[in-house]
A protein has these predicted regions:
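Low-complexity, acidic/polar, glycine-enriched regions of mature
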Residues: 1-186
Length: 186
């Protein structure tokens, strides 16, 4: 049974991402036979939980120039106008509000707006709340994992090359994976 935003451990306040214990990664079909993977090294996430859960907000920003696939030439190509066009669009953002967040136990669904290369489209993130704890240092922490599938063409990321054997170098569907730990601000 799906509930509202309220979760048994719902706590009002401002939560900030703990970058050392968090990650944003992606994968996309490559050469029609495997997947290429990468990460974004610099990002920020702020969640403001409200007394009125529908007024809760999630705001995330990603420095797209921080893309890292482990191959410098590919990373530079991803930063170019063929892909992220970081000189003109240095930041990718995601925003969501409480009326678009639902829980079913620890499982959640978030519908929000992703903006990439100046183009905004709604996306759906599904995931699981890992828990909420009081850490040994006097902080309240929450952890969650989630994923979303986006079509890169929707955001004007259309570069591709035909393969001699048929098909294309890159698939259109990109899976974005989130592994986040957030800390309640005092």
């Amino acid at each position: 049974m799906t509930e509202t935003l309220l979760h048994p451990k719902y706590t009002v306040g401002t939560w900030k991402v703990e970058p050392a214990h968090s990650g944003i990664s992606f994968q996309v079909r490559h050469l029609a036979i495997s997947k290429v993977r990468g990460t974004f090294e610099n990002f920020d996430v702020t969640i403001v939980t409200s007394e009125d859960p529908t007024k809760t907000t999630i705001e995330a920003s990603v420095d797209v120039a921080s893309v890292n696939t482990g191959q410098e030439a590919r990373d530079n190509h991803l930063r170019s106008s063929d892909f992220f066009q970081v000189d003109q669009y240095p930041t990718m953002t995601f925003t969501a509000t409480g009326e678009n967040i639902t829980f079913d136990g620890d499982d959640f669904t978030i519908v929000g707006d992703l903006t990439l290369r100046g183009v905004t489209h709604p996306i759906t993130i599904t995931g699981e709340l890992g828990g909420v704890i009081d850490d040994p240092y006097g902080n309240v922490r929450a952890g969650a994992t989630g994923s979303a599938k986006i079509n890169r063409q929707d955001f004007g990321v259309s570069w591709n090359a035909a393969l001699e054997a048929g098909g294309f170098t890159l698939g259109d569907e990109v899976t974005v994976n989130l592994d986040l730990q957030v800390v309640l601000q005092k």
